[in-house]
Amino acid sequence: MAIIEQVGAREILDSRGNPTVEVEVALEDGTLTRAAVPSGASTGEHEAVELRDGDAERYGGKGVEKAVEAVLDEIGPELAGVDAIEQRVVDQKLVDLDGTPDKSRLGANAILGVSLAVAKAAAESVGLELFRYVGGPNAHVLPVPMMNILNGGAHADTGVDVQEFMIAPIGADSFSEAVRWGAETYHSLKSVLKAKGLATGLGDEGGFAPDLPSNREALDLIASAIEKAGYKLGRDIVLALDVAATEFYRDGAYHFEGSKRSAEQMAGYYGELLDAYPLVSIEDPLSEDDWDGWVRLTSEIGERVQLVGDDLFVTNPERLEEGISRRAGNALLVKVNQIGTLSETLDAVHLATSCGYKSMMSHRSGETEDTTIADLAVATGCGQIKTGAPARSERVAKYNQLLRIEETLGDAARYAGELAFPRFTPEA
């Protein structure tokens, strides 16, 4: 047994200089582990709720002392004496103790920190790496790194509407090779931008954030960078988008590239992009509550491209069930802090997989050095992870952890590669 002796918490900073929660769990056998909680810039309306202090005199109201107190005063005493191996028991206690549907009383940031720290403690106590503890003996698939190398939308102060332009090195033979290809393309993009006299400042997630006239211009620049780095666009490296359409949906219309567009017009735009570029994945192409638009879009282009629900599903099994029943989207974005416990996160991935939906593990724009999602990507075998550009330590930490896992697995390691995107046929 791995009995929980004490649960502690503190306020730390995330990668954007905002406070977040870090939780420590101590077991009776001497095990001590910690987990830090991420935070998003573009957050879905239906996400579990972070508890912030609201005191304008501290951190502009974004302090998390209340969440820390919730861990110390309520959650810690409740979990003392509980076996950390019983993850579902722990997570159910957290949900019951909070007592709200959106975890707003204790805060999803407090609850998630505890849930993840408990899992880490249990894994360490039994002598297993986290990916092996959560995923079992057969966890061996390394995900395709979806590297966000050009930022727009809420992640950058520019005229580019699409929030993330990603590259996916599907033609690599291993995860380590994929990381190298991505890093080389990232540096190539910097030189392409410099040659055109464009800014090379970075967005929240480490991608470049030049002010460009259109979203297509961003795709063209990335295509040039891929070729300049010596790789074949559409065979070695393909493209993906996070549109984050909820961010520019107002009054029943999409305010996109200087005009108001309907869901049908957005669908036509995406169809044109698919004809022009090797796109394998489009995340949040429509607003989080535009169910009818999502259904039509999935019917029109869902056989050609992965359509990922982030704000639409918010890693919530109930929202995902509704999407599956309506045939809206065909993939789930997995953000542990959207739902707030490890058990519920794993339930969402299992539901997606069992219904033929793909899953993509994801960071948030406000990250820490915590690498839990890297282990979860391998544990779930989801085959895809997005955790920013190959730059900024809070992003690179996840890639480095995956490199370690690949090394640990040795000959058993398998890189997901093009199999992660069954709707896409690579060029010869």
UniProtKB/Swiss-Prot annotation:
Entry EC no(s): 4.2.1.11
Active site residues per record: E205 (proton donor), K335 (proton acceptor)
Class of this enzyme: lyase
CDD domains recorded: enolase (cd03313)
Residues annotated for Mg(2+) binding in this entry: D242, E283, D310
Cited SMART domains: Enolase_C (SM01192), Enolase_N (SM01193)
UniProt keywords, alphabetically: Cytoplasm, Glycolysis, Lyase, Magnesium, Metal-binding, Secreted
UniProt keyword Ion transport, yes or no: no
Annotated catalysed reactions: (2R)-2-phosphoglycerate = phosphoenolpyruvate + H2O
Positions contributing to (2R)-2-phosphoglycerate binding: Q163, K335, R364, S365, K386
Essential cofactor(s): Mg(2+)
Pathways involved: Carbohydrate degradation; glycolysis; pyruvate from D-glyceraldehyde 3-phosphate: step 4/5
Cofactor mode of binding and number, as noted: Binds a second Mg(2+) ion via substrate during catalysis.
Gene Ontology CC terms: cell surface; extracellular region; phosphopyruvate hydratase complex
GO-annotated molecular function: magnesium ion binding; phosphopyruvate hydratase activity
Lineage: superkingdom: Bacteria
Location of the protein in the cell: Cytoplasm; Secreted; Cell surface
Gene3D superfamilies per record: Enolase-like C-terminal domain, Enolase-like, N-terminal domain
GO biological process entries: glycolytic process
Matching PANTHER family: ENOLASE (PTHR11902:SF1)
Family: Belongs to the enolase family.
Cited function: Catalyzes the reversible conversion of 2-phosphoglycerate (2-PG) into phosphoenolpyruvate (PEP). It is essential for the degradation of carbohydrates via glycolysis.
NCBIfam families per the UniProt record, alphabetical: eno
Designated name of the protein: Enolase
